[in-house]
């Protein structure tokens, strides 16, 4: 076996672990005025508290940021979060008291989120903002400092008290809302002057029950929703009588079935247009008159034009008949078409 003594001593450097442990370690923070690089001739002194620590490897952004004095330990960080939480709770309590004084606080605002979604009432912007701040602060604390929530019992105290207060407030407000709903149902049965008793849903206007004759009149209009019937009802006050019922009917008769209206549309379309000898679609006219050449018809009688004052003195039907001959003509099949 070969001896490795001389080979090991060739390095000449021996490291003592005890001496390394006794080396002076950094126990204080760098002052805020420390400069990382020399200033240029025209550069100002930096005011930012971003300083680099000696002997530490920069592995995160937090290592560049110097904490404030007295906030370096974990207990002080917990105190920061507890102070923020207390401030948030105080702000929310002030907002709720202001809303209660103004009479603007909704009973379902501070209830549980599931109750709010079931009831369908929107949250008040102020209270929802406070609750959002509380939830965001709790989420931030749980993400950044898990030992604040899961560690010592000192940090759990403010959270438990605030959560219990939140539950108590929600339960009390839910009970008040239930009582108000019960009172609203009792008061909903009202008797309007000159009318029979009817049930009024809470939060809405009461409507007078219609007579049977009026219901019979309105029955066909409900069945045929496509019919052009316009109902105009005038009401005065929260509980008033129906004054007028104006029904404007279209000139064409109303049809009870939609296919009747489609059939009438097809018939009217076929009556409006027809085809000439060349297969082109032209406007159809029911009256078929014998073909006459009316090029010299305007010079009939006294030789005046039909638009002249003398021609206007003639009888109306004859003049209209003359103008129709000037506008229309007949094709080879005898159909009346527009003159081109």
UniProtKB/Swiss-Prot annotation:
Subcellular location(s) of the protein: Nucleus; Chromosome; Cytoplasm, Cytoskeleton, Microtubule organizing center, Centrosome; Cytoplasm, Cytoskeleton, Spindle pole
Name of the protein: Aurora kinase A- and ninein-interacting protein
Residues the record lists as Phosphoserine modifications: 277
Gene Ontology BP terms: double-strand break repair via homologous recombination; negative regulation of double-strand break repair via nonhomologous end joining; spindle organization
Biased composition (Polar residues): 296-313
Region (Disordered): 178-209, 293-317
Quaternary organization: Interacts (via C-terminus) with AURKA (via C-terminus). Interacts (via N-terminus) with NIN; this interaction blocks NIN phosphorylation by both AURKA and GSK3B. Identified in a complex with NIN and AURKA. Interacts with RBBP8/CtIP.
Spans annotated as Interaction with AURKA: 175-340
Gene from which this protein is expressed: Aunip
Biased composition (Basic and acidic residues): 178-190
């Amino acid at each position: 076996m070969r001896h490795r003594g001389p080979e090991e001593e060739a390095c000449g450097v021996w490291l003592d672990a005890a001496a390394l442990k006794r080396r002076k370690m950094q126990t204080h923070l760098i002052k805020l005025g420390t400069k990382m690089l020399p200033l240029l001739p025209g550069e100002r002194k930096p005011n930012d508290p971003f300083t680099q620590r000696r002997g530490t490897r920069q592995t995160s952004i937090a290592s560049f940021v110097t904490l404030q004095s007295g906030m370096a330990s974990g207990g002080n960080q917990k105190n920061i979060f507890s102070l923020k939480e207390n401030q948030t709770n105080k702000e929310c309590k002030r907002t709720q008291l202001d809303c209660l004084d103004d009479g603007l606080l909704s009973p379902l605002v501070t209830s549980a989120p599931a109750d709010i979604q079931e009831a369908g009432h929107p949250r008040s912007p102020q209270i929802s903002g406070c609750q959002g701040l509380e939830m965001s602060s709790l989420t931030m604390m749980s993400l950044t400092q898990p030992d604040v929530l899961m560690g010592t019992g000192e940090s759990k105290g403010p959270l438990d008290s605030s959560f219990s207060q939140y539950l108590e407030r929600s339960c009390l407000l839910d009970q008040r809302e239930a009582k108000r709903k019960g009172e609203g149902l009792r008061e909903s049965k009202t008797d309007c002057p000159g009318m029979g008793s009817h049930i009024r849903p809470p939060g809405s206007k009461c409507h007078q029950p219609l007579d049977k004759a009026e219901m019979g009149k309105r029955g066909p209009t409900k069945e045929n929703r496509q019919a052009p019937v316009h109902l105009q009802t005038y009401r005065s006050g929260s509980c008033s009588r129906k004054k007028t019922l104006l029904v404007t009917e279209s000139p064409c008769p109303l049809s009870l079935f939609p296919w009747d209206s489609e059939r009438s549309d097809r018939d009217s379309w076929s009556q409006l247009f027809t085809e000439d000898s060349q297969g082109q679609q032209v406007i159809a006219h029911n009256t078929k008159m014998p073909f006459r050449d009316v090029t010299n018809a305007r010079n009939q009688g006294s030789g005046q034009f039909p638009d002249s004052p003398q021609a206007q003195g003639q009888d109306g039907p004859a003049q209209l008949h003359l103008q129709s001959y000037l506008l229309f003509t007949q094709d080879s099949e005898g159909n009346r078409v527009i003159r081109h």
